[in-house]
Structure formats: C-alpha cells, structure tokens
Amino acid sequence: VYKRQVVTAGRIVGFQEGIIDMTGPGADYTPFSKTLNLVMVCEPVEGIKQHEYEKAVRFAGFRVAAYIGELARELTPDEIKVYETCGIKEGITQYPDLPRVAYVQMLQSQGLLHDTYVYGVDAKKTLPTILSPTEIMDGAIVSGNCVSACDKNPTYVHENNPVVHDLFEEHGKTLNFVCQIITNENVYLADKERSSDWTAKLCKMLDLDGVIVSQEGFGNPDTDLIMNCKKIEAEGIKTVIITCLLYTSDAAD
C-alpha cells in the first residue's frame, strides 16, 4: 500500500471539487489525511478550456509521480507483500473446491470531467475487459475526475482498491479470486445495454460462482449498477453490489 502520493491542486477545474482535511473531524473520513502528500499547485494560462486544463494537470501529476518512483526504485522497502494470481485454468486445478469469484469494477465515464482512463484510453471508448487484479496496482487505471470528489475514485484509490485487497486476503482460503472485470458508465442507454450485456457474458464465460460489483459515482450510474446486477444474476451467478448511501439514514434515496 502506497503511503505517499502526489496531489494536484490549483484553481478549480470543475465545480464540486474536493478538499483534504489533514486535521480535525474531517480527517477521519479521508485516507489522505494519513498519507505524505506532495502538493503541486497548478495555475492555468488565461483562456484554457476545462478539458485541456484537466489533462495538463493530470499529466503533470504523472510526471512528478514517475520521477519520485524512479528515485525510490533502488531503495530497500520497509515491507514487502506478495500478491500472486494464477491463470484461469491453473486456478481451477489449484482450487477445485473453492467458489470462483470475480470483481466487476464500474468506472466513471460520463464525460464533462467525469472520466477514467485504462492504459491511457478513455473508458468511454472501451468495452468490458478482463484484467489481472495486480495490473491496477501498477497504475493500469487512472482518474480524470474533477467533479464530486467524495464520490469518485482518485488514482490512489484505484491503485489501492480495498475490494481487490480483501479478495486477495481470501484467495486460496475461502474463494478463488479469478480475475477483475472493468466496465464503464456511459450516459446513453444503448451504451449501458451493450456494456452490461458484455459484462454478464464475460461472467458466464468464466463460469463464475459469485461476483462483487462496485459502482463509481451516483445518479446516472445507478442504472448501470442495477443492469449489471440483474443480468449477471440472470446467468445464475450470485451477485453482491457495493454502492453509496446518499442523503438519508433510512436509504430512501
């Protein structure tokens, strides 16, 4: 788990951006109050468009993070933890009696500064894809979100995804963590139908016993969440969803 991170900051890119409380009661609700943060203050040139500004800030953060990573490449780490996955066929042989479980991660892809990138490709332009869970630890998924920060996943959270870590802890003990499936949350119904159909098809092809689905964002992506859940369950696969509780304690929303 990374304890240091690069934070890009500056003039607002999109409304509803977030702040990090390093002390006080708010600090208990963010992991970033406990990390060592190198903050980059980025000032936009006059007249720059929002999407150009977001991309420039995002790539500036990448360059600094890569530079810091290179400085630490030859250092001896304080702790080493091994996460190991096997091939699908090998997993069947190694764990024949354990339930086959996959993690379906829905990625924000609504545009208008609600974007996520997979190996540099805008998630809006992708189809549901199988990944090895260790790929996300190496930065396969990065965030381009600048709106509703409390309900979006920054790159740090993708790299340290708690669902992936928890599934690895149970891998080979109570379950066989087969793979991770990523899918998008596009705004048009045709895209939602296509992606949810494809996600359910992949789950069926992998002969899964159980699936955990996590959602990013709220509102429009709620549709994607339920479509994914219903279609995966229609294939006879036990499905659990992870979503957010908004506004009211009785979950009326």
Task: Give the residues covered by each predicted segment.
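Metallocofactor- and cofactor-centric catalytic cores in central/energy metabolism, strongly enriched
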Residues: 3-166, 172-196, 221
